[in-house]
Structures are given as C-alpha cells and as structure tokens.
C-alpha cells in the first residue's frame, strides 16, 4: 500500500490534450490570469517597507518576518495540497487558492489603518496558503491545455504575466499614495482582481487528464537528492528564491526616497526583458553556460550595491540584477530534469518544496540591516545566494 503523500498533480504531465498541436485559447486566458494572481504574494517583501513605517523601532524585527508568513507555507502545505488535488482536481484547487488569497488580502484592510501587526501576520499567512495552492495547481493546469513540445515557452509566458503583476506594484502604490495618502487600497484592488480571475476560471470548462496509477511520493523525491546534479539544482532553486525575496525586501530600503518602491518596478521590468532575451539565447547557447554568465554578472552587481549610494546607480544596478536573475529557475529546473528524465515528477516535487527558502530572507536581511544600520549591507545575504548559484553553475556539466 502506498503510504507516501502524493505530489503527482503539482507536476506538469503529458495528457491527451497536450499531444494535440493546438492550444485552446479559450482556456488559456483564465489560466494565464492565474499566473498574474500568483504574483500578488510577491508584493509582501517590498510592501513591508511601507508597513514598517506604521510601527516603532521596537517592532521592526517582527515586521521583517512578514515575508516568512507567505513562503513558510510552501514547505508546510505543498504536499497536503497536492494530495487534495488528487481528489478534487487542479481547477478546484486553484479556486480554493483564490479564495484564501481574497480573504488574506482583505483581513488587514478590514482591520483598518493603524491595525495591530498581528492582523498583517494573519492576512499574509492566509495569502501564503492561497498562493501555495495556486502554485501547486496553475502550472499543471497549464500543462493540460498546451502541447507538450510547447510547455517551456508557455511556462515562460506565464512567468511574464506573473512578473507583470509585480511590475505594476510600484505605479499602483505611488498613485494610491498620491490620491489617498495611503497604499492600503492596493489590498482590495488585488482582492477584486482575484475574484474576477476566479469567476473567469470557474466559468471556463477545463478537461483535466485522467489520474496516473502511480504518484510520486515524498520518499521518492528526497531519495533523488543522492544525485549530485539534482542536489545542486535543488539548492540552486532555494538560493534563487531566497535571493529574489531578499532583493524585494531590500529594494525599497536602498534609497531614502518616498519613491524608492520604484526600484521594484525596475527590477521586474528588467526581469521581463531578461526572460524574453533568455528565451532567444537559450536556443543557441547551453543553459549552464548562460547561467554562469548571468550569475557572474549578478555577483558583480551585488558587490556594486554594497558600495554605491547614488539613486541612479542603485536603480540601474537593481534593474540589471533583475535581468541577470530572469532565467535562473527555469535553468536549474531543466538541468535537474534532464539529469533524471525518468524521475521528472519527483524533481518537480523537490523544486516546489525549495520555494519555501524564501521564508528566511526577510528575517535574515532585516537582522543585517538592523545590525549594520545600512540597508546596503543586506546585499551580503543576496550575494551569498548568488555566490552559491555561480559555484553550482561551474559544478554542473554542460550538455551538448
């Protein structure tokens, strides 16, 4: 009797629909909207800079744990949610994620201006639960409607939609502050968009594939860590997520300016450009070699952000870091899968669990900033993450 908790439905698998050369564009729209909604949880790291202004210095250590409340749930709930999805399906799991997202966004808003920090923890915790369900469901839901040979390109499109939601964060917050004096209307706006996305998905018929007779279990996933390539790539994804969240946490603190959140806009705008450029380059250059180039550049940019203080230089360095980090997740994921192609489900399970590494970024970066009194020193944590990824890129073998 299989006792391992199953992960099969959190992994893209080849379904009869995927073998068809055409994409059902009627279904594609609401699924890509899911990627857009997926990006809402990533606003927590940069928005903590605004929340921190509402609390005294004695509470700043607690505020820095807010991003942890989102990413912790990837570690705790990814497996149970995958098991639930085995029973109720991918679309239903995504809709449950939308519901938790709406409630999580509205809790601190309904609590009101100047609410206790606990309301933010409760709201962002629920937001993390919802986002875990969305992450578990949306990628494989996309896999049911696109042909297998085009999965990579459509997953890239999905990431562009996710990054676009982050790109719009700073302009929306800046406009809200100018019009209302507060950023907090962002929460019901995001909640409303999530409701619309849920209605759109619910109204769309999605033919999900039949269940597989054999599901990947947790023991199967962790057993793969004995493969050096899979281990390097799993830790690479963990460092990528941790570094990415760290940049989001620090970007609004690197410039002492009310418009400092615009550094987040530059970061994600350049990431979108980097994703598009990477999609073109990776057809012509080895993925590992491209990873080496980008991580070398990213490490140099981290060093620059430790030293530079001019606003223009900070904007440029943060933006270029976003460009360099654009294709990292896809590269580690692809290299690990190619190392053990017969264990693709187990590899993907490890990657989902690795996302939980983002939970450490806020507390660690916050502690460094409080210890040093300078947000730029928080880039030491990001540099450590990038340094590992650069080292791993040289340990990985280039497949011709």
Where are these regions (language model features)?
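Hydrophobic core of transmembrane alpha-helices in multi-pass small-molecule transporters
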Residues: 117-133, 313-327
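Central cavity-lining transmembrane alpha-helices of secondary-active solute carriers
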Residues: 65-83, 265-278
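C-terminal ends and interior cores of transmembrane alpha-helices
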Residues: 99-114, 297-309
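Extracytoplasmic gate region of multi-pass secondary transporters
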Residues: 44-45, 227-272
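Cytoplasmic helix-loop-helix junction between adjacent transmembrane helices
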Residues: 123-160
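Extracytoplasmic
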Residues: 26-57, 139, 247-252
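Helix-loop-helix hairpin linking two adjacent transmembrane segments in secondary transporters
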Residues: 149, 157-209
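Intracellular juxtamembrane helix-capping segments at the cytosolic ends
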Residues: 133-147, 326-341
């Amino acid at each position: 009797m299989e006792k391992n908790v199953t992960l099969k439905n959190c992994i893209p698998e080849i379904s009869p629909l995927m073998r068809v050369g055409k994409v059902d564009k009627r279904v594609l729209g609401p699924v890509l909207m899911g990627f857009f909604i997926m990006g809402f949880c990533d606003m927590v790291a940069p928005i903590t800079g605004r929340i921190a202004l509402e609390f005294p210095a004695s509470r700043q250590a607690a505020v820095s744990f807010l991003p942890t409340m989102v990413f912790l749930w990837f570690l705790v709930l990814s497996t149970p949610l995958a098991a639930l999805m085995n029973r109720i399906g991918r679309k239903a799991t995504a809709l449950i994620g939308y519901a938790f997202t709406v409630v999580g966004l509205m809790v601190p808003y309904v609590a009101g201006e100047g609410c206790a920090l606990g309301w933010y923890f409760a709201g962002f915790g629920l937001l993390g639960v919802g986002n875990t369900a969305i992450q578990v469901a949306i990628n494989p839901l996309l896999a049911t409607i696109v042909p297998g040979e085009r999965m990579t390109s459509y997953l890239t499109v999905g990431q562009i939609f996710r990054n676009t939601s982050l790109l719009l964060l700073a302009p929306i917050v800046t406009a809200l502050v100018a019009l209302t004096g507060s950023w907090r209307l962002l929460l019901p706006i995001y909640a409303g968009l999530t409701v619309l996305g849920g209605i759109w998905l619910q109204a769309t018929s999605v033919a999900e594939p039949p269940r597989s007779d054999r599901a990947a279990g947790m023991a199967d996933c962790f057993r793969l860590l004995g493969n050096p390539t899979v281990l390097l790539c799993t830790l690479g994804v963990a460092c990528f997520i941790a570094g990415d969240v760290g940049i989001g946490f620090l970007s609004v603190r690197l410039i002492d300016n009310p418009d400092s959140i615009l550094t987040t806009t530059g970061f994600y705008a350049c990431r979108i450009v980097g994703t598009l450029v990477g999609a073109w380059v990776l057809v012509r250059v080895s993925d590992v070699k491209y990873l080496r180039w980008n991580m070398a550049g990213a490490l140099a940019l981290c060093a620059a952000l430790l030293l530079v203080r001019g606003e223009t230089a900070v904007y440029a360095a943060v933006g270029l870091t976003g460009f360099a980090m654009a294709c990292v997740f896809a590269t580690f994921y692809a290299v690990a899968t190619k190392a053990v192609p017969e264990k693709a489900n187990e590899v993907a399970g490890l990657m989902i669990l690795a996302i939980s590494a983002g939970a450490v970024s806020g507390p660690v970066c916050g502690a460094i900033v409080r210890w040093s009194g300078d947000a730029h020193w928080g880039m030491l944590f990001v540099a450590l993450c990038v340094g590992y990824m650069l080292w791993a890129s040289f340990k990985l073998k280039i497949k011709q």
